[in-house]
A protein has these predicted regions:
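Acidic-enriched and Gly/Ser
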Residues: 1-150
Length: 150
């Protein structure tokens, strides 16, 4: 089963939400809200590649997806519905614009035009700075292919 334009993925650990934390061998629920974007699972396992896709991502790789990909929502009548990305049996369509990074062979890579930076700590100077990080200064951690060519 392959889609012409979308990746077919399933949530990591088959869970749409990461809303539990194990403390002392007991699972505690950290959020019961399905609207809470912080509890949404953001990692997906690639099940199938798009037919037109020709790139480095392979079946079994992990994608870092948008927080709305796996979410439930409620319609106008209060009925629970799956998001527009839902396909069937805990499988979802993911467009190339809906994910930012992918993990291949246990190493993360940025996807498409996205890049990821790490803030730089404020350096001591004569001028007092009331911040812990330098404004508008960062270290490139995961560059995209366009930036690598520059």
């Amino acid at each position: 089963m392959r889609s012409p334009y979308n990746f077919i993925v399933k949530p990591l650990n088959n869970k749409r939400y990461n809303n539990t934390k194990k403390i002392g061998g007991i699972d505690f629920v950290t959020s019961t809200s399905q609207e809470n974007h912080i509890a949404s699972n953001r990692e997906a396992i690639v099940i199938s590649l798009p037919i037109i896709y020709n790139g480095p991502i392979e079946i079994g790789d992990t994608l870092l997806v948008h927080h709305n990909v796996f979410k439930f929502y409620y319609d106008m009548k209060g009925r629970q519905k799956s998001c527009k990305s839902f396909f069937r049996d805990n499988l979802f369509f993911v467009d190339s614009e809906q994910f930012y990074m992918y993990k291949h062979n246990n190493k993360w890579y940025s996807h498409d035009r996205y890049c990821f930076v790490k803030p730089v700590k404020t350096k001591k100077s004569i001028i007092y700075k009331n911040t812990s990080e330098e404004p508008l200064v960062a270290e490139m951690i995961y560059p995209n292919t366009y930036l690598k060519k520059q």
